[in-house]
Amino acid sequence: MQNLSITQVDTAKVSVIQDFKEITKMRLALSVVFSSVAGYLLGVDTISWSTLLLLSIGGYFMVGASNAFNQIIERDLDVLMDRTKNRPIPSGRMSVNTAFIIAAVFTISGISVLYFINPQTAMFGAISIFIYVSLYTPLKTKTPLSVFIGAIPGAIPFMLGWVAATNDFGIEPGTLFMIQFFWQFPHFWAIGWFLFDDYKKGGFFMLPTGKKDKSTATQIVIYTVWTVVTSLIPVFGVTGKLYITPVSGVLILILGAFLLRYAIRLYKVKDAKTAKQLMLASVSYITLLQIIYVADKFIRAWI
């Protein structure tokens, strides 16, 4: 009996930890932290490990807060979809009050931690949470334009790192914002495509036309092209201190060609399998792009 009780307690602890990770979307939060760190490394002259730590913690809190508030607001819709019905709130494993406390603590903690870096970083963090929770989340069931609104907080992390490093907003962080802003569309429209039926159950408008049609596929191709084009702008030396060499530009162009290949394939075949491949390709693209940008800067400094 004692062994059974210990096992039950251990299982309960694991469940609580898993629910906490899910309500804050830890994996997504860590990918956002990665973007912020990349932006910081691009903007900084001398790395401050304490600032980097604060940025990572604050960024995690910021994303966790947004996701927790999102799941509170969408709890009645999440229960309708296969992908989300087992989340902590709709499954009944976590109360709304508990989720709200987590969201509130994460919001206050995130903004406070980012403020220790500089006020501008905290301001952009607060703006990100506000837009995601107050505008993007409620608009998802009302208009396809919600993706355009959601692309704003989604594009802030890359830029946020630069602002944390420099306490300044100029053409450099603006360019980083633009790159990740355009990237959001092929990424999220691909998700909206292969999860179309599930999103439909919850009443979400995730595709620009509301349908898996030629017009949506065309827009995916167009925004994929814009993503690649904006990614190459720093090669031409017109974005202030943000610069990459032609060699890095060629690498990004190759990555862009692979990304565009999947977008064009989706335009041709219009199936869920290709949409999922495009989504995975988009994740690889933005991750490798950020690595190339950072590597380019430090290799130039060492040579």
What does each model-found stretch correspond to?
Residues Q2-S15, I73-M94, W189-T216:
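Cytosolic, membrane-interface loops and tails of multi-pass inner-membrane proteins
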Residues R83-T121, K212-F236:
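Multi-pass membrane catalytic core of lipid/isoprenoid biosynthesis enzymes
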Residues V96-A164:
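Intramembrane alpha-helical segments
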Residues I291-I303:
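Juxtamembrane boundary at the C-terminal end of a transmembrane helix
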Residues F34-R75, R83, T107, I111, ...:
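Membrane-embedded alpha-helical segments that form the functional core of polytopic membrane enzymes
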Residues F61-F69, I131-P138, I179-F196, V228-S231, ...:
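Transmembrane alpha-helical segments that form the membrane-embedded catalytic/substrate-channel core
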Residues S95, S215, L260-L288:
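Interfacial loop-to-transmembrane junctions
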Residues S31-V37, R87-P90, I149-A165, K214-S215, ...:
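Small-residue-rich segments of transmembrane alpha-helices in multi-pass membrane proteins
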